[in-house]
Amino acid sequence: MTFNGWLQILIYIGILLLLVKPLGGYMTRVFTGERTLLSYVLGPLERGLYRIAGTDEREEQHWTTYSISMLLFSLAGFLMLYFLQRFQASLPYNPAGMTSIGPELSFNNAASFVTNTNWQNYGGESTMSYLVQMAGFTVQNFVSAATGIALAIALIRAFSRASGKAIGNFWVDLTRATLYVLLPACIVMTLVFVYLGVPQTLGPYVNATTLEGAQQTIAVGPVASQLAIKMLGTNGGGFFNANSAHPFENPDAISNLIQMLAIFAIGAALTNVFGRMVGNQRQGWAILAAMGTLFIAGVIVTYWAEAAGNPLVHALGVQGGNMEGKEVRFGITMSSLFAVITTAASCGAVNGMLGSFTAIGGMIPLINLQLGEVIVGGVGAGFYGILMFVIIAIFVSGLMVGRTPEYLGKKIEAKEVKMAMLAVLCLPAGMLIFTAISVVLPSAVASIGNPGPHGFSEILYAYSSAAANNGSAFAGLSANTTWYNITLGVVMLIGRFLVIVPALAIAGSLIAKKTVPASAGTFPTDGPLFVGLLVGTILIVGGLTFFPALALGPIVEHLSMIAGQAF
C-alpha cells in the first residue's frame, strides 16, 4: 500500500461525494414533476410517448397495478431478447456472420439482461451480432436500470406522503428515468469515451497484418454507446469478453475513473433524493454513511490483501503485490478499488480478473454480493434493498425499547417486517441451495477450473453473483453448460423479482398509513447511533448467514496459502 494509492482512492471518494447533492436535486425535480432545463427539449417527446402509449401521467397506480405493469414489461423484454438471439443468424447488422444462439444460453442471457445482472456465459465479440448488442442488450441495459430507479422512487413516495393509496405510475416513472436521467448522461459519456479512444462503429471487424506477417482480426463495433449505459445503469455486461480490462472498453486511467464514478453516481444520489422527498436530508446522509462505512472497510481490506501479495510467490524471491490478473495500466490500487465498487453496486463489470485475486482480496467482493448489494447497490435496486434492512433495524430497535417501531412517522408492523425478511432471505436461499446442489452434481463439478476450496468459491461466487444481480464471476468456472445456464437464470429471476414484489408490497402498506408525529420516545434515524445499528443489522442478518460457506471457500484457501499450499 502506498501514499499515492490512498490518494487515488480519496480523490475518487471526494469527487463522488461532490456529485451526490446536485444529481440528487436534479433527480428529485424529475420525479416530483418539476421542470428542469431538459424539460424544454424532452417535455414534448415525453408527452408524445404518453399519447402513443395511452398513458395519463396524472393517473397513479395501486401497488398491485404498479407491480403487474412492471412484471409484464419485464416479461415482454425477456421474450424480445430471447427471440432476438434465437434468430440472430437471419437478422441484419451481423457483418461477422454470427450464428443463432441455443435455447439454454438464450434463456440465461435474457434473464441476465432483463434483471440487470448481465452475467455473460459468452464472449460478446465472438458470439453476438451488432443488432443483438444494440437492440437487445443495450436496450435492456436502459430499461432494466430505469425499472430499478422507478421502483426506488415508488418506495420513497410511501415514506414521503402523509397518506394515500397510490405509489405512482410505473410507465411515467420508467419514462422519466430513461429520458431525463439515463439518456442525457449516456450521450455525454459516449462522446467522452469516443474521444478517449473507445470504438463506435457499425463497420465490420478490422483485418490487420502483424509485425510478424500474421493476419489478425480486430473486433470493433458500437462499443462506446453500450459502455456508457453499462456503467451508469450498473449493468456490467461488456461488448468484449474481457470487459473493462479490454483496452477498447477502458483505454486509460481517465476512462477508468469515469467508469467507477458512473457505477456509484445514481445509487449514491438516490439517498439524497430520499432525504429531499421525505423533507429531511439528514435521513439520506445517514443511509449513505452506512453504505460508505461498509464500502470503505471493503476497500481497505481488499487493497491490503492485494498489496501484500502471495507469500508463495515471495518465497520464490519475487517481491511485491499480487499483479496476477491485473492490467498494468491500472495497477493494484485501481484494480482493487474497481473490484469493490463493481460488487458493492450490482454492476459486475471488471477491469481485472477477480478469480486471480488473493483469497482475502477475492472474499470481499464475494461478501459484497452476499450482503444483498446494499452498499450503494444497483441503480434503484441498492436503495430499495437497503431500505429492507432499515425496516429490520427499526424493528429491532423497537423490540429493544419496548414500543411500536416507527420510521419517518410510519409505523413498522408485522406485515412490513415479514415482507422485508422475505426480500432479505430469498437471496441466501438462492445462493446457498443451488451451490450445495452444484458441488455434489457431477456435471456441475466438471465445470470447475480449480480444485479444492477455490473451486468451491467459483461455484459459490457464481450463484451469489446471479442472486445479487451482479454478473461478475470467478472466471475459472466454465458455466456455459445446460445446468448452469438454466439454474443461474432461475436464480437471477429470484434475486430480482422476489425482492421487488415484497418491496412494492411494503410501499403499498406504508402509503396507506397516516404519518405519526415524532415524540420524545421516537428513535432518531438521522444520527450515528442509527448508522451503527443499520451497519450491524446488515452484517449480522446479511453476513453471518454465509460464514460457514465462506469458511469452506476463501477462508480455508487463505489459511492453506499461509501453510504453503496453492490451488
Swiss-Prot record:
InterPro entries membership: KdpA
Entry GO MF terms: P-type potassium transmembrane transporter activity; potassium ion binding
Transmembrane segments: 5-25, 64-84, 136-156, 179-199, 254-274, 285-305, 328-350, 375-395, 421-441, 459-481, 486-506, 529-549
Membrane-topology annotation of the record: Multi-pass membrane protein
Cysteine pairs bridged by disulfides in the record: none
Keywords, ordered alphabetically: Cell inner membrane, Cell membrane, Ion transport, Membrane, Potassium, Potassium transport, Transmembrane, Transmembrane helix, Transport
Domain of life: Bacteria
Major subcellular location class: membrane
Cell compartments where the protein resides: Cell inner membrane
Quaternary organization: The system is composed of three essential subunits: KdpA, KdpB and KdpC.
PANTHER family associated with the record: POTASSIUM-TRANSPORTING ATPASE A CHAIN, POTASSIUM-TRANSPORTING ATPASE POTASSIUM-BINDING SUBUNIT
Homology family: Belongs to the KdpA family.
Function: Part of the high-affinity ATP-driven potassium transport (or Kdp) system, which catalyzes the hydrolysis of ATP coupled with the electrogenic transport of potassium into the cytoplasm. This subunit binds the periplasmic potassium ions and delivers the ions to the membrane domain of KdpB through an intramembrane tunnel.
Protein name: Potassium-transporting ATPase potassium-binding subunit
The organism of origin for this protein: Rhizobium rhizogenes (strain K84 / ATCC BAA-868)
Gene: kdpA
